A protein has these predicted regions:
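Cytoplasmic helix-loop-helix junction between adjacent transmembrane helices
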Residues: 105-145
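Conserved MFS/SLC helix-loop-helix module at the cytosolic interface between two early adjacent transmembrane helices
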Residues: 61-100
Length: 232
């Protein structure tokens, strides 16, 4: 008798939707709270620009290394570590006491958050059937941008109740909770998850690119260069 198909992959999508929301909450709230931050820390507009740039530079510098790390170590371990890391520095943002401390904290925050989107992309590639990836990623991006649009209102509401410092603390907690839940429940491949039925597993792996395929990673580029012919 055929096994009943499970839908464990949709729980993975739920985790990714939650993580997308966390990334936007943690990265976007600082712009909304910048007037209060500038006033309390005595910062100029130029100094706030440097703080924003510190995040962007770290994000760009660490995105490829953390993506490589996720490819080698798997997203269970990597996302657990980087989400806990950047959530800790989201909380630490509320404890900043000067321009220098804020600059360092936001740089380290950006270094952690850099791996979020590559990690999520790899998770989708391992868990979502090719026939569903477009729809799932469309839902994911839409939800993430809705959160981005709501973040200023949420940040202002929370800051109005408890100030900008506690807002960063409150925004950092969901990421810590997410990292713990992710590490306990998730597995890098559906083959490793006890709750996935054979029917669901067959659907997920059908048509999935094999890691040994000629268009996988460096093997593709080596073959491309090997067979390259000069133009005449």
């Amino acid at each position: 008798m055929p096994s009943r198909p499970t839908r464990v992959r949709y729980r993975v999508v739920g985790f990714m939707l939650a993580l997308g929301a966390v990334t936007y909450l943690d990265r976007a709230c600082i712009a909304t709270l910048s007037p209060d931050i500038r006033r309390d820390l005595g910062l100029s507009k130029d100094q706030m620009s440097w703080i924003y740039s510190a995040f962007a530079i770290a994000y760009a510098a660490f995105e490829i290394p953390t993506a490589w790390w996720a490819d080698r170590m798997g997203t269970r371990r990597v996302l657990t570590r980087i989400v806990a890391w950047w959530s800790a520095f989201t909380i630490a943002t509320g404890a900043a006491w000067s321009f220098g401390s804020m600059l360092v904290i936001r740089f380290l925050f950006g270094a952690g958050e850099a791996g979020a989107w590559p990690g999520m992309a790899r998770t989708f590639s391992r868990w979502i059937p090719r026939s569903e990836r477009g729809t799932v990623q469309g839902i994911f991006f839409a939800a993430a941008h809705v959160t981005g649009g709501l973040t200023p209102m949420i940040a202002l509401a929370v800051a109005g109740l408890c100030g900008w410092r506690w807002t960063f603390v409150i925004f950092g907690v969901p990421g810590i909770v997410w990292a713990i839940a992710w590490h306990r429940w998730f597995r890098d491949d559906p083959e490793q998850h006890a709750a996935v039925s054979p029917a669901e597993l067959a659907k997920i792996v059908a048509g999935r690119e094999q890691s040994s395929g000629q268009h996988e990673g460096w093997a593709y580029w080596r073959q491309l260069l090997r067979h390259r012919r000069p133009a005449h």
